[in-house]
Protein backbone atom coordinates (compact mmCIF):
# COMPACT_ATOMS: atom_id res chain seq x y z
CA UNK A 1 0.00 0.00 0.00
CA UNK A 2 1.09 3.56 -0.64
CA UNK A 3 0.47 5.01 2.81
CA UNK A 4 3.33 6.73 4.55
CA UNK A 5 5.52 6.66 1.46
CA UNK A 6 5.84 10.42 1.41
CA UNK A 7 9.45 11.60 1.00
CA UNK A 8 9.94 14.77 3.05
CA UNK A 9 12.36 16.66 0.84
CA UNK A 10 11.62 20.14 2.19
CA UNK A 11 10.16 21.81 5.23
CA UNK A 12 7.26 23.04 3.14
CA UNK A 13 6.40 19.50 2.11
CA UNK A 14 6.60 18.38 5.70
CA UNK A 15 4.31 21.17 6.82
CA UNK A 16 1.66 20.17 4.33
CA UNK A 17 1.96 16.42 4.66
CA UNK A 18 -0.34 16.21 7.68
CA UNK A 19 -3.30 16.73 5.41
CA UNK A 20 -2.17 14.31 2.71
CA UNK A 21 -2.09 10.51 2.63
CA UNK A 22 1.38 9.43 3.68
CA UNK A 23 2.95 7.16 1.23
CA UNK A 24 6.23 5.78 2.51
CA UNK A 25 6.70 3.52 5.49
CA UNK A 26 9.47 1.27 6.68
CA UNK A 27 7.40 -1.82 7.39
CA UNK A 28 3.82 -3.04 7.04
CA UNK A 29 1.52 -2.04 9.84
CA UNK A 30 0.31 -4.86 12.08
CA UNK A 31 -3.09 -6.29 11.26
CA UNK A 32 -5.57 -7.02 13.99
CA UNK A 33 -8.68 -9.09 14.67
CA UNK A 34 -11.89 -8.11 16.44
CA UNK A 35 -12.73 -11.29 18.31
CA UNK A 36 -16.47 -10.93 17.75
CA UNK A 37 -15.56 -12.57 14.44
CA UNK A 38 -15.07 -15.80 16.43
CA UNK A 39 -17.98 -15.30 18.81
CA UNK A 40 -19.61 -18.63 17.94
CA UNK A 41 -16.49 -20.73 18.50
CA UNK A 42 -13.87 -18.88 20.53
CA UNK A 43 -15.09 -19.91 23.98
CA UNK A 44 -14.96 -23.60 23.02
CA UNK A 45 -11.15 -23.51 22.83
CA UNK A 46 -9.74 -20.09 23.62
CA UNK A 47 -6.06 -21.00 23.51
CA UNK A 48 -6.44 -23.10 20.38
CA UNK A 49 -8.36 -20.42 18.51
CA UNK A 50 -5.98 -17.66 19.58
CA UNK A 51 -3.12 -19.83 18.33
CA UNK A 52 -4.84 -20.09 14.94
CA UNK A 53 -5.12 -16.30 14.78
CA UNK A 54 -1.44 -15.94 15.62
CA UNK A 55 -0.50 -18.55 13.01
CA UNK A 56 -2.22 -16.44 10.34
CA UNK A 57 0.13 -13.58 11.16
CA UNK A 58 -2.24 -11.26 12.99
CA UNK A 59 -0.58 -9.16 15.69
CA UNK A 60 -3.22 -6.91 17.28
CA UNK A 61 -6.23 -8.17 19.22
CA UNK A 62 -9.47 -6.43 20.12
CA UNK A 63 -11.68 -8.32 22.55
CA UNK A 64 -15.44 -8.23 22.97
CA UNK A 65 -17.97 -9.95 25.21
CA UNK A 66 -18.13 -13.73 25.34
CA UNK A 67 -20.62 -16.41 26.26
CA UNK A 68 -18.75 -17.39 29.42
CA UNK A 69 -18.06 -13.99 30.92
CA UNK A 70 -14.87 -12.31 31.97
CA UNK A 71 -12.34 -12.25 29.18
CA UNK A 72 -13.28 -15.51 27.47
CA UNK A 73 -13.41 -17.24 30.83
CA UNK A 74 -10.10 -15.77 31.94
CA UNK A 75 -9.08 -12.85 34.10
CA UNK A 76 -7.83 -9.79 32.25
CA UNK A 77 -4.22 -10.53 33.19
CA UNK A 78 -4.51 -14.16 32.09
CA UNK A 79 -5.88 -13.10 28.72
CA UNK A 80 -3.21 -10.42 28.36
CA UNK A 81 -0.48 -12.94 29.14
CA UNK A 82 -1.94 -15.44 26.66
CA UNK A 83 -1.68 -12.90 23.88
CA UNK A 84 1.90 -12.06 24.83
CA UNK A 85 2.84 -15.74 24.79
CA UNK A 86 1.54 -15.98 21.22
CA UNK A 87 3.38 -12.89 20.03
CA UNK A 88 0.22 -10.78 19.85
CA UNK A 89 -0.77 -7.52 21.49
CA UNK A 90 -4.12 -7.08 23.23
CA UNK A 91 -4.79 -3.50 22.18
CA UNK A 92 -8.44 -2.71 22.90
CA UNK A 93 -11.61 -4.00 24.48
CA UNK A 94 -15.26 -3.57 23.43
CA UNK A 95 -18.04 -2.92 25.93
CA UNK A 96 -21.66 -1.87 25.55
CA UNK A 97 -22.71 1.63 26.50
CA UNK A 98 -25.92 0.70 28.33
CA UNK A 99 -27.58 -2.53 29.55
CA UNK A 100 -27.44 -5.03 26.70
CA UNK A 101 -30.60 -5.58 24.69
CA UNK A 102 -30.08 -8.58 22.39
CA UNK A 103 -31.45 -8.52 18.89
CA UNK A 104 -34.31 -10.94 18.09
CA UNK A 105 -33.12 -14.53 17.95
CA UNK A 106 -29.93 -13.84 19.90
CA UNK A 107 -30.15 -16.04 23.00
CA UNK A 108 -28.31 -14.61 25.99
CA UNK A 109 -30.17 -16.58 28.66
CA UNK A 110 -27.10 -18.62 29.55
CA UNK A 111 -24.67 -15.72 29.41
CA UNK A 112 -23.57 -13.82 32.53
CA UNK A 113 -24.49 -10.16 32.89
CA UNK A 114 -22.40 -7.83 30.76
CA UNK A 115 -20.95 -4.72 32.35
CA UNK A 116 -21.82 -1.49 30.60
CA UNK A 117 -20.46 2.05 30.58
CA UNK A 118 -23.58 3.60 32.06
CA UNK A 119 -23.49 1.51 35.23
CA UNK A 120 -20.01 0.00 35.43
CA UNK A 121 -17.47 2.32 33.77
CA UNK A 122 -15.14 2.43 36.76
CA UNK A 123 -15.28 -1.34 37.29
CA UNK A 124 -14.55 -1.96 33.60
CA UNK A 125 -11.55 0.35 33.65
CA UNK A 126 -10.26 -1.14 36.89
CA UNK A 127 -10.49 -4.66 35.43
CA UNK A 128 -8.05 -3.72 32.68
CA UNK A 129 -5.37 -2.39 35.01
CA UNK A 130 -1.96 -3.93 34.38
CA UNK A 131 -2.86 -5.32 30.95
CA UNK A 132 -1.62 -4.16 27.55
CA UNK A 133 -5.00 -2.62 26.67
CA UNK A 134 -4.77 1.04 25.61
CA UNK A 135 -8.26 1.61 24.18
CA UNK A 136 -11.70 1.08 25.66
CA UNK A 137 -14.34 1.03 22.92
CA UNK A 138 -18.07 1.59 23.23
CA UNK A 139 -19.45 -0.99 20.82
CA UNK A 140 -22.94 0.50 20.73
CA UNK A 141 -25.34 2.61 22.75
CA UNK A 142 -29.05 3.43 22.36
CA UNK A 143 -29.54 6.35 19.94
CA UNK A 144 -33.11 5.81 18.75
CA UNK A 145 -34.37 9.25 19.72
CA UNK A 146 -33.13 12.65 20.86
CA UNK A 147 -33.41 11.74 24.53
CA UNK A 148 -31.28 8.63 24.07
CA UNK A 149 -28.66 10.59 22.14
CA UNK A 150 -28.52 13.17 24.92
CA UNK A 151 -28.08 10.44 27.52
CA UNK A 152 -25.42 8.79 25.36
CA UNK A 153 -23.42 12.04 25.36
CA UNK A 154 -23.55 12.10 29.15
CA UNK A 155 -22.53 8.44 29.46
CA UNK A 156 -19.65 8.74 27.02
CA UNK A 157 -18.37 11.99 28.52
CA UNK A 158 -18.27 10.49 32.00
CA UNK A 159 -16.70 7.26 30.75
CA UNK A 160 -14.10 9.23 28.81
CA UNK A 161 -12.99 10.99 31.97
CA UNK A 162 -12.76 7.71 33.88
CA UNK A 163 -10.79 6.09 31.05
CA UNK A 164 -8.40 9.03 30.76
CA UNK A 165 -7.70 8.97 34.49
CA UNK A 166 -6.53 5.37 34.08
CA UNK A 167 -4.39 6.10 31.03
CA UNK A 168 -6.90 4.64 28.57
CA UNK A 169 -8.47 6.22 25.50
CA UNK A 170 -12.22 5.89 25.03
CA UNK A 171 -13.41 5.34 21.46
CA UNK A 172 -16.85 4.98 19.95
CA UNK A 173 -17.57 2.29 17.37
CA UNK A 174 -20.24 3.12 14.79
CA UNK A 175 -22.78 1.12 12.89
CA UNK A 176 -24.90 2.76 10.18
CA UNK A 177 -27.51 4.19 12.56
CA UNK A 178 -25.16 6.89 13.82
CA UNK A 179 -25.33 8.55 10.41
CA UNK A 180 -29.13 8.54 10.16
CA UNK A 181 -31.22 11.57 11.04
CA UNK A 182 -33.01 11.15 14.37
CA UNK A 183 -35.17 14.10 15.37
CA UNK A 184 -33.22 16.25 12.94
CA UNK A 185 -29.75 15.24 14.08
CA UNK A 186 -27.18 12.52 13.46
CA UNK A 187 -25.75 10.87 16.55
CA UNK A 188 -22.26 10.84 15.05
CA UNK A 189 -22.38 14.61 14.55
CA UNK A 190 -23.69 15.17 18.07
CA UNK A 191 -20.95 13.02 19.62
CA UNK A 192 -18.32 14.82 17.52
CA UNK A 193 -19.45 18.29 18.56
CA UNK A 194 -20.59 17.83 22.14
CA UNK A 195 -17.91 15.49 23.49
CA UNK A 196 -14.36 16.91 23.57
CA UNK A 197 -11.88 15.07 21.38
CA UNK A 198 -9.63 14.41 24.37
CA UNK A 199 -12.47 12.44 25.98
CA UNK A 200 -13.74 10.56 22.93
CA UNK A 201 -12.06 9.25 19.82
CA UNK A 202 -13.66 7.09 17.14
CA UNK A 203 -13.16 3.56 15.91
CA UNK A 204 -14.59 3.93 12.43
CA UNK A 205 -16.22 0.80 11.09
CA UNK A 206 -15.44 1.25 7.42
CA UNK A 207 -18.11 -1.18 6.27
CA UNK A 208 -20.97 0.31 8.25
CA UNK A 209 -19.94 3.85 7.35
CA UNK A 210 -19.87 2.94 3.67
CA UNK A 211 -23.28 1.27 3.97
CA UNK A 212 -24.61 4.49 5.49
CA UNK A 213 -23.48 6.41 2.40
CA UNK A 214 -20.70 8.19 4.26
CA UNK A 215 -17.23 8.79 2.83
CA UNK A 216 -14.69 7.79 5.51
CA UNK A 217 -12.00 9.95 3.92
CA UNK A 218 -14.16 13.04 4.32
CA UNK A 219 -14.74 12.11 7.97
CA UNK A 220 -10.97 11.93 8.45
CA UNK A 221 -10.50 15.33 6.86
CA UNK A 222 -13.21 16.87 9.03
CA UNK A 223 -11.66 15.56 12.26
CA UNK A 224 -8.00 14.74 11.58
CA UNK A 225 -6.36 12.62 14.22
CA UNK A 226 -9.59 11.51 15.90
CA UNK A 227 -9.71 7.98 14.43
CA UNK A 228 -6.95 5.86 16.02
CA UNK A 229 -8.80 2.58 15.35
CA UNK A 230 -10.84 1.11 12.54
CA UNK A 231 -12.84 -1.98 11.70
CA UNK A 232 -12.16 -3.42 8.28
CA UNK A 233 -15.55 -4.86 7.41
CA UNK A 234 -16.89 -5.62 3.94
CA UNK A 235 -20.30 -6.07 2.34
CA UNK A 236 -21.58 -7.67 -0.83
CA UNK A 237 -23.37 -5.76 -3.57
CA UNK A 238 -26.49 -4.17 -2.13
CA UNK A 239 -25.16 -4.41 1.43
CA UNK A 240 -27.23 -7.50 2.15
CA UNK A 241 -24.48 -9.64 3.67
CA UNK A 242 -21.15 -9.16 5.40
CA UNK A 243 -18.38 -10.92 3.48
CA UNK A 244 -14.67 -11.59 4.08
CA UNK A 245 -12.67 -8.37 4.03
CA UNK A 246 -11.51 -7.39 0.56
CA UNK A 247 -13.98 -9.62 -1.27
CA UNK A 248 -16.86 -7.14 -1.31
CA UNK A 249 -17.53 -3.60 -2.47
CA UNK A 250 -15.79 -1.37 0.11
CA UNK A 251 -12.88 0.55 -1.42
CA UNK A 252 -10.34 -0.16 1.31
CA UNK A 253 -7.32 1.02 -0.63
CA UNK A 254 -8.66 4.54 -1.03
CA UNK A 255 -9.69 4.70 2.62
CA UNK A 256 -6.50 3.25 4.03
CA UNK A 257 -4.39 5.51 1.84
CA UNK A 258 -5.86 8.38 3.88
CA UNK A 259 -5.34 6.75 7.27
CA UNK A 260 -2.52 9.11 8.21
CA UNK A 261 -5.01 11.96 8.18
CA UNK A 262 -7.20 9.93 10.52
CA UNK A 263 -4.36 9.33 12.95
CA UNK A 264 -5.01 5.62 12.58
CA UNK A 265 -2.83 3.22 14.53
CA UNK A 266 -4.66 -0.11 14.63
CA UNK A 267 -6.65 -1.98 11.99
CA UNK A 268 -9.02 -4.77 13.02
CA UNK A 269 -10.61 -7.21 10.61
CA UNK A 270 -14.19 -7.94 11.66
CA UNK A 271 -16.72 -10.32 10.11
CA UNK A 272 -19.78 -10.72 12.29
CA UNK A 273 -20.07 -14.41 13.19
CA UNK A 274 -19.32 -16.02 9.80
CA UNK A 275 -19.80 -19.73 9.20
CA UNK A 276 -16.04 -20.25 9.21
CA UNK A 277 -14.22 -17.48 11.06
CA UNK A 278 -10.70 -18.74 10.40
CA UNK A 279 -11.40 -19.03 6.68
CA UNK A 280 -12.73 -15.47 6.64
CA UNK A 281 -9.67 -14.20 8.52
CA UNK A 282 -7.41 -16.06 6.10
CA UNK A 283 -9.07 -14.36 3.14
CA UNK A 284 -9.03 -11.00 4.90
CA UNK A 285 -5.31 -11.28 5.67
CA UNK A 286 -4.55 -12.07 2.05
CA UNK A 287 -6.67 -9.23 0.67
CA UNK A 288 -5.95 -6.47 3.18
CA UNK A 289 -2.36 -7.26 4.15
CA UNK A 290 -0.87 -5.75 0.96
CA UNK A 291 -2.77 -2.50 1.60
CA UNK A 292 -1.01 -1.99 4.93
Predicted segments, located by residue:
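N-terminal pre-domain/capping segments
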Residues: 2-134, 164, 225, 286-292
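Active-site acidic/histidine proton-transfer and metal-coordination neighborhood
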Residues: 10-12, 16, 21, 101-201
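Hydrophobic faces of well-ordered beta-strands that scaffold small-molecule active sites
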Residues: 31-34, 61-63, 90-95, 136-138, ...
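Acidic-and-aromatic substrate-binding clefts and catalytic sites of carbohydrate-active enzymes
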Residues: 38-44, 64-75, 98-102, 113-117, ...
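Alpha-helical scaffolding within the catalytic cores
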Residues: 46-48, 74-79, 119-124, 185-189, ...
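Acidic/histidine-rich catalytic cores of soluble enzymes
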Residues: 60-62, 163-249
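H/E-rich (His + Asp/Glu) clusters that bind or coordinate divalent metals
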Residues: 245-269
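Aromatic-rich peripheral "rim/lid" segments of glycoside hydrolase catalytic domains that contact
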Residues: 273-292
Amino acid sequence: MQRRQFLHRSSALLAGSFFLPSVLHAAPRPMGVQLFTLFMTLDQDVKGNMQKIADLGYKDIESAFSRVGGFYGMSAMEFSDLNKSLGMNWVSHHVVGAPFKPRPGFDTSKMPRMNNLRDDAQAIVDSLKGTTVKYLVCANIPIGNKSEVTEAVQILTKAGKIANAAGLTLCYHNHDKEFELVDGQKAFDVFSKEIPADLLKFELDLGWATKAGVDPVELFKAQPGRFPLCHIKDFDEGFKNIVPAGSGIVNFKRILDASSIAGMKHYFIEHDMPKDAIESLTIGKKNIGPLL
